[in-house]
């Protein structure tokens, strides 16, 4: 069964725009409900999909953070070209890292980071995550266990330079947190199984933003946008956006 690849989305509403950024191995579906909620509150939302994401995992390994950052910048430019002068950004996981990078690269009204990593995981741990993603993708395609095993063996022979580059990106953004002055809302799931939750404290403590807040979600895991506190998260992000000086 061929999986229909997810698409970027653009929900047009009011003149305030929010760029929504998904995580590594994720896609726009991870931020779609948030996008629909914000649209209902009058915010225009756009979520790009990074190169190599939402497609067979064999394509992921041939892309890297430079490609994905270009997709983020293209998403920002897309909103600018549509006439949106004022743009906020909200990102999940790697998307949160990119949100911070946007914060010291282009004018941004406000930043929401959700479960964004600031600690470097070993390449082995990251690689395990990629293998798990690849296996899950193949299962969703309805392939037999035998075919999946064969394809996974082949997949494991492909070198993944991406992971080293991903580590370097996180380290680089962490080094530049003190260049961020935009209002920032740091969101972190207490039971995050993917990243070190202390990342949230690093972001909160090291950015120079005079207006900043941090909130811990006690019942949520890493993909907080799809977890059981998502409705509360939606309301909190909306309240933060409403507090900005648009």
From Swiss-Prot:
Domain of life: Bacteria
Record's protein name: Carboxylesterase
Keyword Hydrolase: yes
Keyword Hydrolase appears in the UniProt entry: yes
pH influence on activity: Optimum pH is 9.
Pfam families named in the record: Hydrolase_4
The EC number(s) this enzyme carries: 3.1.1.1
Taxonomic path: Bacteria, Bacillati, Bacillota, Bacilli, Bacillales
SUPFAM superfamilies for the chain: alpha/beta-Hydrolases
Keywords noted in UniProt: Hydrolase, Serine esterase
Thermal dependence summary for this entry: Optimum temperature is 70 degrees Celsius.
Catalytic activity: a carboxylic ester + H2O = an alcohol + a carboxylate + H(+)
Molecular-function GO terms, alphabetical: carboxylesterase activity
Residues at the catalytic site: 93 (nucleophile), 192 (charge relay system), 222 (charge relay system)
């Amino acid at each position: 069964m061929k999986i229909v690849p997810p698409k970027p989305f653009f929900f047009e509403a009011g003149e305030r725009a929010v760029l929504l950024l998904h995580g590594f191995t994720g896609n726009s579906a991870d931020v779609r409900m948030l996008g629909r909620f914000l649209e209902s509150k009058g915010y225009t939302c756009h979520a790009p999909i990074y190169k190599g994401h939402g497609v067979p995992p064999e394509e992921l390994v041939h892309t890297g953070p430079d490609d994905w950052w270009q997709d983020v910048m293209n998403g920002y430019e897309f909103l600018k070209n549509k006439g949106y002068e004022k743009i906020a950004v909200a990102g999940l996981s790697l998307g949160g890292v990119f949100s911070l990078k946007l914060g010291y690269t282009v004018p941004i009204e406000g930043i929401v980071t959700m479960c964004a990593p600031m600690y470097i995981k070993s390449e082995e741990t990251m690689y395990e995550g990629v293998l798990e993603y690849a296996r899950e993708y193949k299962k969703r395609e309805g392939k037999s266990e035998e075919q999946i095993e064969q394809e996974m063996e082949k997949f494991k022979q492909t070198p993944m330079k991406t992971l080293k580059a991903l580590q370097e990106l996180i380290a680089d953004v962490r080094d530049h947190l003190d260049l961020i002055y935009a209002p920032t809302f740091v969101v972190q799931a207490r039971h995050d199984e993917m990243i070190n939750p202390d990342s949230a404290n690093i972001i909160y403590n090291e950015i120079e933003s005079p207006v900043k807040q941090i909130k811990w979600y006690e019942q949520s895991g890493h993909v907080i946008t799809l977890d059981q506190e998502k409705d509360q998260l939606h309301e909190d992000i909306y309240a933060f956006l409403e507090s900005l000086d648009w």
